[in-house]
Design a protein with these regions (language model features):
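Flexible "arm" and connector segments at domain edges
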Residues: 1-61, 65-143
Length: 143
């Protein structure tokens, strides 16, 4: 987990905001809250861009990242490996070309981000951490 996501998780814990230990579907209430928070911060980001104040822009970018990381915390998703996989996928776009509208067209060598295995690993690691100790670990813990 990145330092940034860890800080947001700390905030969630201090303010009794939902924290999931592993990837978990969110309730409708949580979904609505996260969408509203992201939209609010995105709107504030657009306003700061229109104003041209770099300090305000930097603050609003941080606020948007904060609520996006908060969404990851609420869903129990460690974003570090997810971001790395998306980065790997994005770099596989080398060899494509940019259209007139600025969109990058993917080359045949493009490889889409494969997120499912990452979430499965996160769920498995969480389940492993929750298993009761046995054998040597249990004896050492009792010592």
């Amino acid at each position: 987990m990145t330092d940034e996501q860890s800080m947001v998780e700390e905030f969630h814990k201090k303010f009794d905001i939902l924290v999931q230990a592993s990837p978990t579907a969110a309730s409708e209430e949580t979904k609505r809250l996260r969408i509203r928070l992201i939209q609010e911060e995105f709107d504030e980001l657009k306003e700061s861009m229109a104003e041209g104040n770099l300090a305000a822009l930097a603050k609003e970018m941080a606020d948007l990242l904060y609520v996006v990381y908060g969404t990851a915390v609420s869903y129990g998703i460690d974003m570090d490996p997810v971001f790395r996989e998306v980065h790997r996928s994005n770099l596989s776009k080398v060899g494509g070309y940019k259209r007139e509208d600025g969109k990058w067209v993917k080359p045949p060598t493009y490889s889409p981000a494969d997120i499912e295995p990452l979430l499965a690993m996160q769920m498995s690691a969480s389940e492993e951490a929750q298993r009761p100790l046995g054998g040597v670990e249990e004896m050492l813990r009792g010592a």
